[in-house]
């Protein structure tokens, strides 16, 4: 069994690398335009909650705030929310991080139960159930899997959120 004492000495720090994948500038503008038009934009991501909040800030995502921060939930927190409470929670939450495929489907259904018309974007096999359930499932045409494209009502040929805003 390997523990800290086995590697505590004789090591040399070689370096640290950071990577960043910033949002596209046109996505930032499109999110703002959608919000101005009264569309509640929500982000469901596989990223860590802290990363998701940072991206939400970069793209100007608006929504309810608690303690000066945008309301955001992790998949672990979301799984504890009852079906009865989920519609209200889904409405007031702007960011969902580390969400499982079945949770995406629950979110779509919860918003629809409140009378919302739900558009859902996705690119993977895991997105297919939510894409199919959404009023408008939107698959990525370049990076999307065939399963996601088959489940969607619309395919974004350029994988660009701005195209959704233009279509609206």
Give short role names for the model-derived ranges:
Residues 43, 118-119, 123:
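Hydrophobic "anchor" residues on beta-strands that sit immediately upstream
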Residues 1-110, 114, 128, 134-136, ...:
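Cytosolic catalytic headpieces and adjacent flexible linkers of membrane translocases
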């Amino acid at each position: 069994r390997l523990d800290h004492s086995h590697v505590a000495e004789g090591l040399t720090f070689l370096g640290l690398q950071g990577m960043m994948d910033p949002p596209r500038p046109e996505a930032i503008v499109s999110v703002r335009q959608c919000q101005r038009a009264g569309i509640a934009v929500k982000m469901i991501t596989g990223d860590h909650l802290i990363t998701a909040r940072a991206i939400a800030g970069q793209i100007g995502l608006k929504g309810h705030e608690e303690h000066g921060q945008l309301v955001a939930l992790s998949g672990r927190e979301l799984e504890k929310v009852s079906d009865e409470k989920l519609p209200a929670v889904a409405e007031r939450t702007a960011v969902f991080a580390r969400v499982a495929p079945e949770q995406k489907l629950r979110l779509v259904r919860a918003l629809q139960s409140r009378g919302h018309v739900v558009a859902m974007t996705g690119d993977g096999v895991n997105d297919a159930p939510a894409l199919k359930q959404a009023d408008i499932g939107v698959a990525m045409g370049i990076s999307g899997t065939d399963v996601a494209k088959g489940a969607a009502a619309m395919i974004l040929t350029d994988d660009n959120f701005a195209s959704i805003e233009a279509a609206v």
